[in-house]
Amino acid sequence: MSGALLLFGVFIWVGAKSPVEAWSLLFKGAFGDWFSWQNSLQRAAPLMLTALCVAIPARAGLTVIGGEGALVLGGLACAGLPYLFAPPANGFGTAMLLLAAALAGAVWIALVGALRQYRGVNETISSLLLAYTAIALFKHFVEGPMRDPASLNKPSTRTLADGLLIGGISGTDIHWALVFGIVACVILGLWLFFTTSGFATRIVGGNARAALLVGLPGARIMVGACAIGGACAGLAGGLEVAAVHTNANASLIAGLGYTGILVSFVARHNPWAVIPVAVLFGGFGAAGSLLQRRMDVPDASVMVLQGFAFLLILASEALRGKLFAPRAPKPAPTPAPQPTPVVAEAAS
């Protein structure tokens, strides 16, 4: 991240601003006081879950970047379940909403894995296109059949009942979605590194042909990894509805799924490393408004910093083992063959 911060400083300097001041405001806006910490942690909660949507399939050898689609469909499922029946306005009803959100995301991303395994469709392209499809479906239902008549200039679904909402952690402005994200990262890390099925997933991701030779069901494992990742992103959408927005509206389409891609790559697809990286990126997002107020730069400029971090990660992957690689010793020169001496025959 130091390289990304340095490049961001150059970017600020080119705009005739002080890089040192920008770095200072980044830290203050993200982690300068308890209020900043709360803002950073709240922003980090959905990033943990959307990053898992990339990290878990990546461990199975798939590059899935469609977490945004699973997130918006998860939010739509959470807000749409009360249209089908009235869930009890208590913790059990909230669990039903979150389960519906997770199932919606799981099915959507599992479709990506199935297309890859049974139709040979590239998962990167299909997941991205399905994300756009999910956003279109979301807009159709929110602005059409599920629109609340009371929502005027900002179409949304009906507001969830108070008993179905997820409150904040006592004494803080942080909602319980942060706990969901941390627990999901910890549990999936334990599953990935300490269970037989997690080990099989890593084998498939490392060498699919070798996994097939030893009898591992590669197709089922890959689709299952996609379903787990999709469930995490769908849960993120459900938590955004139940804990933040109270309904499904256009605010869900905020790019959290795409930022989760950056978080996962910076964390090297390690579920445990996702936690601190998500907090860091959440802090960058929280510091954007402070940069805008103090330095008169767009708050979206922090996305440039995120982009630099992503580019450096990709560059390090591409150049690993190639830059400054130790030179192989030159082979010793082969001595030239000596002519065989001709022995003169003795005169008879």
Indicate where each model-derived feature is located.
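Helix-loop-helix "hairpin" substructures at the membrane interface of multi-pass membrane proteins
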Residues: P87, V107, S170-N247, P271-W272, ...
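Structural signal for alpha-helical transmembrane segments and their membrane-water exit/capping regions
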Residues: G3-E21, L25-A30, G61, F141-V142, ...
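Cytosolic-side transmembrane-helix boundaries in multi-pass membrane proteins
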Residues: M1-G3, G9, G206, L213-R220, ...
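Hydrophobic core segments of alpha-helical transmembrane domains in multi-pass membrane transport
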Residues: M1-W13, T50-V54, G75-L81, A102-V107, ...
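Transmembrane helix-bundle core of multi-pass membrane transporters
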Residues: E123-F194, N247, Q338, V343-A347
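Transmembrane alpha-helical segments in multi-pass inner-membrane proteins
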Residues: A227, A233, G237-G307
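Short loop segments and helix-boundary regions at transmembrane helix junctions
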Residues: A58-G67, P88-N153, T159-L160, F194-T196, ...
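Single transmembrane alpha-helix segments in multi-pass membrane proteins
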Residues: F8-G15, L25, A30-F85, L98, ...
